[in-house]
């Protein structure tokens, strides 16, 4: 048995934190947790597809200004049978009394056609989408990491999305950065720490 950590057997510690497989059998973990309240404020605000460029450009700018307590994603798509649109989804994990200050600007990103904001247990938020959409069992996804969302990228995404005849197609921009970006690229086997999306 070996006990590994940042100061004891650091190469094996690095490998066990995402460097691949076949480095050994881990029999126990010691985790350092960060304090967080159980409930978070989460929601989704939808806008017409015709405002996709405007909303995605807003997201690209605003997501870089919010504090670590807020993560904002953007997406194009819709449930089967619904007209596609553009939406912003978010989680606020800070003081619930301060959430509205950061949510209100989202309502000004475009013409709101749907809004749902609620307080939820963060485990329920983490699981949302796992079983709600049966298409997930037969879907196909590709992804990558980028440092910024340019207007050229937004134009390409919207143009290609609008050209898709299958309205089950979705496009999602997931907001990273924050504490994730303050870990050096060489500190773990996950080397995309400088990607904001």
Show where each model-derived region lies.
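Soluble FAD-dependent oxygen oxidases
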Residues: 1-197
């Amino acid at each position: 048995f070996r006990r590994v950590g940042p100061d004891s057997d650091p190469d094996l510690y690095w490998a066990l934190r995402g460097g691949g497989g076949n480095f050994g059998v881990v029999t126990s973990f010691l985790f350092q947790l960060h304090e967080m309240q159980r409930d978070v404020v989460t929601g989704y605000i939808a806008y017409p597809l015709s405002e996709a460029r405007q909303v995605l450009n807003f997201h690209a700018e605003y997501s870089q200004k919010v504090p670590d307590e807020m993560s904002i994603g953007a997406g194009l798509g819709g449930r089967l049978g619904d007209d596609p649109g553009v939406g912003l989804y978010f989680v606020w994990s800070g003081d619930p009394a301060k959430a509205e200050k950061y949510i209100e600007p989202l309502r000004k990103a475009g013409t709101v056609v749907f809004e749902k904001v609620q307080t939820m247990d963060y485990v329920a938020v983490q699981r949302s989408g796992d079983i709600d959409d049966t298409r997930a069992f037969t879907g196909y996804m590709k992804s990558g990491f980028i440092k910024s969302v340019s207007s050229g990228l937004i134009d390409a995404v919207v143009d290609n999305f609008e050209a898709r005849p299958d309205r089950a197609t979705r496009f999602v921009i997931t907001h990273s950065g924050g504490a994730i970006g303050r870990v050096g690229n060489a500190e773990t086997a996950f080397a995309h720490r400088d990607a904001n999306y």
